[in-house]
Amino acid sequence: MLIEAVRLTLFPAMMAFAASSDLLTMTIANRVSLILIAGFAALALLSGLGGAEVLSHVEAAAVVLGVAFFCFACGWIGGGDAKLAAVTALWLGFGNLFSYLVYASLLGGALTLLIVQFRTIPLPRLLAGREWAERLHSQGAGVPYGVALAAAALLVYPQTEWMTAVGL
């Protein structure tokens, strides 16, 4: 019963936290990745995931981390985004990775277009004085891509072995 509760809540809760943190502060704390790594390890152990399957998930994370680190080095994404994408790949594995990357790309593109459009209009009075809104509205600021990464993860997560094992 505890395992099912962890399967149902840990990953989605951490994705929601990462998205809101990135939106409000443009940072994703290292503890998000560390909690998700520890959660994956514990859940894999308690669920009886085989060594080959665990290794496959780790390989998926390593591939994504390598590509994401390159993107970070080029200045295209933030370090928190790179770590979030990699730890998400750890949980999703290769079987769900393609869907995740497609969703992340589409949602990231849509988010970027919305933010670019948002920056062309005056900041609504309701948002004036709110640091996160002013940062988001600033022409020189980046895009909180963690929002798209987390949303994509939440779209794919119901198809993972973690959720199908719960039987919902």
For every predicted segment, state its role:
Residues 1-168:
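A membrane-topology feature that recognizes alpha-helical transmembrane segments
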